[in-house]
Each structure stands twice: as C-alpha cells, then as structure tokens.
C-alpha cells in the first residue's frame, strides 16, 4: 500500500510520527509510511494538534481541513487533507 495517494480532490497520507523531535520536518519514507517529525510531545493530544497545524501550513489549508482518520492514539496514522492548495515536493514525489 502506498504512503501517499489522491482520492478525488483529497490527499491521503499514511504517516509514522516521531514526537518530541528537535524540529518539524518530513523525514522521508519509513517502510510503507511517510515519517514526519514534530516538536510536540505525545501528551493530551498535543502531538495530534501540532501535526494538524503543521500539515495545514504545508498544504495551505485550514486546520479543520486536516482530518486524522486512523491512529488518533498511536504513532501510525492515516490523515486526509481536504482539497490541498499546495502539495510539498517531498510528498508530490511519492503520490501514486
């Protein structure tokens, strides 16, 4: 299964999250998932909120347009970005 794919106008990402990183970044592929490092700790939903904000900024959409579909409580997540205005080059290269 692909790490990144389109479904209509939406972008879907299978992610592996690394919380408490030194900076926010898209690291690259981690098995069949896209590894994303974020600075927020995995406490009380802070990492999920920070991930949504980071992906919204990258794709130039509102935070509400980033939906965590699976993996709310784990490092492995599936995220849907509704009608992204922009897709970063690191993600575009992986779209199938």
UniProtKB/Swiss-Prot annotation:
A Pfam family assignment: DUF167
Gene3D superfamilies, per the entry: YggU-like
Matches recorded under SUPFAM superfamilies: YggU-like
Protein name listed in UniProt: UPF0235 protein VC0395_A0010/VC395_0502
Cellular component terms (Gene Ontology): cytoplasm
Family classification: Belongs to the UPF0235 family.
